[in-house]
Amino acid sequence: MKTLRRLATLAAAAGAAAVTAVGLAPAASAAPDPVLASPYLYQWGGQTSASAAMSATDVKAFTLAFMLSDGGCTPKWDGTRALTGSDATMINQIRSAGGDVIPSFGGWSGTKLGAKCTSASALAGAYQKVIDAYQLKAIDLDIENTDEFENAAVQDRILNAVKLTKQKNPGLRVVITIGTETTGPNTWGKRLINQAKAIGANVDVWSVMPFDFSNGGDMAAHTKSAVDGLKNQLKTTFGWNDDVAYRHSGLSSMNGKTDNAGETVTVANFKAIRDYAAGHHLARFTFWATNRDCSGGGECSGISQGKYDFTKIVAGYTG
């Protein structure tokens, strides 16, 4: 499914180096909302400089990928790097420049905390270590790997851990990011949403990844249809009206060529998606990833585009 994410994470695991501890600055009280407009950024390839992206685009927040299991229930960046070191340094740099971050747990590749932590309380404890380490305002749970997504017991463990984490951190916002069909969440996605309601997990934002559908088509239209489907499921589950459901919805697109041959999100597509998101006041508008936000192949988007074209579009999103 998410081949580009898979390859990147495997590369990180192979090349991770030891890091040294640094002090971490807390999120500034006037810092931007890390949920709303925060493109994904990772440390293992492509354009990894948060400072360069902020200077070039005026983007103020990043979704940092990925927090994984070290083989047990201990959270580490890409499953290898401690919570101190280069990642903490980057968070300090982002905050010093007036920005903020939202770490993402999960992704496609690597060992997942949801699967390795044997209870909801243990998983909540793993989340708490990261929240405390970075004094976070929000976390993103990217539940796309089958070990977590297509597993009822793990889905419930994650949702119960969210409930416990929200109780301990009343101001924390939790985003759950899942894959989608063009019509909205599939059976497993619908189950996850319904279980969140049943458990009382109090998820703040539900975000779908509207790509890897097929081998082409109008990606702006596919994205709108997928998010409309998410909105409809939230209406059904929670009894919200359209406006409230949209304001609990979000999307995480992909710039340029996706993992599926022939499927491409162009800059024009992404602008249309931005306009749709703004028109419905979506709570989250992002993409994978600033690292790839450059022209051509290799570790770039695979299309002809200006450097940081997609990040600039996200930077201008105000909800």
Which residue ranges define each predicted feature?
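Outer-membrane beta-barrel proteins
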Residues: A56, K60, A133-Y134, E144-N145, ...
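Conserved, mostly hydrophobic/aromatic
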Residues: F62, P103, L141, W206-V208, ...
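Substrate-binding surface in catalytic domains of secreted glycosidases
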Residues: T74-A82, D147-N241, H248-V265, I303-Q305
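Flexible loop residues that form catalytic
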Residues: M67, E144, F211, M254, ...
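N-terminal carbohydrate-binding/catalytic regions of secreted carbohydrate-active enzymes
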Residues: A31-A133, I273-R284, T290-T318
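Stable alpha-helical elements in mature extracytoplasmic
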Residues: A50, S86-M90, S119, L123-Y127, ...
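Short loop/turn motifs at secondary-structure junctions
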Residues: D58, Q135-K137, N202, A245, ...
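Secretory targeting and sorting signals
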Residues: M1-A30
